[in-house]
């Protein structure tokens, strides 16, 4: 009897082992199937994302996340990449609320293991960008500064990887209308390049050029010119008769032209650029075309019509040296191009902070005008406006003061008739409380220009 009981117990034990082994084998098979499916979906996701089919990629990324949770559990580090990918897809379709939620989940998983991990930087920057896009600029600043701190802890104070974070912080401070802080995060990059490459490196020239572009973009004309003059000194000291030096001279000319104070200071750098071009052995006539266009536009903006005409005709003369330039030159002169532009307000009333966007509505107006062979506008009139007459007077004044490079056909200036501009703006609904502005102000954005 005892022998029989032992046999039964042994059989039961073998059965349990067999069941456990079978279940374990089945689980392993299921896991392998899920992993294989996950790999297929991951490749599909990458293809969709590369093809910019972001809406479709959301479904794939969601399935990848679900499978990863089944395989590894809800708190596994293996969820970091799937969360980041899904958040990125939502970001690309403009669903910033969902993107922000998922980026936070991704960051929390990483922080649960190491709260200063360099792995945090990428999702933190992405989260900051999502806050920027949704105009939550204070939150964006907080996140970007956290990313910057982690970057410094892991890579040192002057590493190059931080540059993109400073650029993103600049955009946040633009949103907050804090120009001082925006300037800081652009100028700080110059110190990074000086420290990393050495002050005599040509890489520092690239950083100076980037800083000058920032000052130009933000309407800080004098600051831009000071940086450009420093860049010019560096290039001249290298005896560098190069395209880069000519480009710097063009940009210095443009900064003077935007101020509109001294025609001599605006024209002189361009004449130096033409002299440098003449010294080149392998001459790029397209570069000469850009200089001549700048020269003509500069003369036009100061009302020196005859000098402008000569510069524009010199552009057409280039066709005799290289007939392949004809299509490009014809295209550049095919329609009027603004060389001096006046700002029409994008919001009314002027200089009033927006406290509640719901108080504002969308308005528009359409202006019709001609451009004479001198580049001046004529027969300026409002075709339509809604609300009527709210910004009509300031728009008329702005277009009347705008100066164009006229259309040219075969080196002859042409009159352009019936041109139209549609301008959209926002206005506070209780517009009757305010009076219409009487004078436009000079636009603080870069003008349309071949070197812009």
Residue ranges and their predicted role:
Residues 2-12:
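Bacterial N-terminal signal peptides that target proteins for export
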Residues 11-21:
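Bacterial N-terminal signal peptides
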Residues 68, 106, 110, 150-151, ...:
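Hydrophobic packing position at a conserved site in alpha-helical tandem repeat units
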Residues 27, 33-54, 58, 74-80, ...:
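Charge-biased low-complexity segments
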Residues 98-101, 139-142, 146, 181-184, ...:
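Structural signature of tandem alpha-helical TPR/SEL1-like repeats
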Residues 22-26:
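Sec/Tat signal peptide C-region and signal peptidase I cleavage site
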Residues 68-111:
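Mid-chain, structured segments of secreted extracytoplasmic proteins
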């Amino acid at each position: 009897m005892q022998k029989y009981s032992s046999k039964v117990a042994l059989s039961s034990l073998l059965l349990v082992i067999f069941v456990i082994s079978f279940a374990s084998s089945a689980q392993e098979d299921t896991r392998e199937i899920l992993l294989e499916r996950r790999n297929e979906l991951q490749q599909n996701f990458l293809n969709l994302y590369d093809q910019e089919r972001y809406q479709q990629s959301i479904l794939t990324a969601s399935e990848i996340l679900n499978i990863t949770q089944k395989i590894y559990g809800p708190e596994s580090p293996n969820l970091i990449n799937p969360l980041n990918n899904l958040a990125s897809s939502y970001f690309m379709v403009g669903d910033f609320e969902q993107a922000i939620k998922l980026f936070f989940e991704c960051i929390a998983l990483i922080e649960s293991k190491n709260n200063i991990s360099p792995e945090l930087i990428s999702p933190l920057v992405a989260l900051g960008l999502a806050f920027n896009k949704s105009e939550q600029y204070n939150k964006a600043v907080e996140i970007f500064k956290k990313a910057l701190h982690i970057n410094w802890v892991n890579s040192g104070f002057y590493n190059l990887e931080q540059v993109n974070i400073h650029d993103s912080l600049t955009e946040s401070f633009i949103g907050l209308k804090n120009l001082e802080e925006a300037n800081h995060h652009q100028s700080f990059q110059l110190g990074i390049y000086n420290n990393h490459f050495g002050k005599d490196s040509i890489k520092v020239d690239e950083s100076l050029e980037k800083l000058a572009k920032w000052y130009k973009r933000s309407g800080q004309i004098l600051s831009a010119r000071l940086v450009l003059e420093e860049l010019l000194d560096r290039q001249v000291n290298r005896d560098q008769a190069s395209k880069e030096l000519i480009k710097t001279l063009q940009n210095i000319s443009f900064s003077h032209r935007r101020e509109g104070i001294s025609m001599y200071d605006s024209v002189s750098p361009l004449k130096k650029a033409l002299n440098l071009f003449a010294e080149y052995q392998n001459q790029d006539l397209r570069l000469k075309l850009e200089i001549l266009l700048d020269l003509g536009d500069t003369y036009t903006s100061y009302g020196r019509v005859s000098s402008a005409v000569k510069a524009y005709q010199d552009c057409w003369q280039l066709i005799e040296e290289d007939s392949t330039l004809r299509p490009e030159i014809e295209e550049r002169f095919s329609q009027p191009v603004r060389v001096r532009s006046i700002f029409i307000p994008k919001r009314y009333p002027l200089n009033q902070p927006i406290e509640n966007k719901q108080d504002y509505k969308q308005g528009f107006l359409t202006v019709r005008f001609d451009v004479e062979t001198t580049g001046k506008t004529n027969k300026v009139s409002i075709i339509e406006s809604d609300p009527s007459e709210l910004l009509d007077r300031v728009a008329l004044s702005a277009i009347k003061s705008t100066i164009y490079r006229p259309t040219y056909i075969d080196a002859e200036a042409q009159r352009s008739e019936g041109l139209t501009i549609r301008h959209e703006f926002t206005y506070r609904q209780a517009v009757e409380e305010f009076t219409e502005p009487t004078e436009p102000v000079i636009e603080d954005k870069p003008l349309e220009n071949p070197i812009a």
